[in-house]
Amino acid sequence: GARYFRLGKQADFYSSDRPIEMLQEIRASCPHLEMLQIDNVNPNSVVKEGGEEITKAIVEYCTPGNIAAFGVESFDPVVVKANLLNTTPVMAMKAIRIINKYGAQRGENGLPKFLPGINIIFGLLQENKESHRRNMEAFDQIMREGLLLRRINIRQVAVLPHTFLEEHGGTKYLSKNKKYYWKWRDEIRQKVDNPMLERILPKGTIIQDVWTE
């Protein structure tokens, strides 16, 4: 039977119906799982009451290499407010610390058990050079605190019809700042992504059961 499972396509695993019990039941029903991992997580849910208990359950019942995909989108408070984003930079940092507190320990396959991943979006309302500086400032703080990020996804915003973004600016900031995106993206890759990868997988690390695609 199937032994590899990813509980994906949900907006926030932590707000699922009885997530701890669900993981316990999956493990009890299929004790010989090879992989059990989750998908998206709202950082606010990690910080709120009960969030740490769910985090500990994910570390206990899921397999190592697990990622909490955080839709932070921007660490610039001005951009967060202008776009009605769910997570403030302060809440995002708290959630990153909590996930690291319980999930940074290395598992039997050689990977940390449970780490945050950060999604950043370029082209949001009120974005400017200060927005990139704020993003880099947050990433620098993460590095200085010795925290781990499994990955950073950087995308350009998709302006969909009849959305808040389309009605309040559309592609204005995307068009205005597009000339900076390669530079901004490359700075994150060189100053954060690559050093973080060396921190997560130092030279000599052996990773078990690797599947390539």
List the predicted regions and their residue ranges.
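Extended C-terminal regions of large enzymes
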Residues: 132-133
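Conserved SAM/AdoMet-binding glycine-rich loop
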Residues: 1-117, 122-127
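Auxiliary Fe-S-binding modules of radical SAM enzymes
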Residues: 31-33, 103-104, 110-112, 136, ...
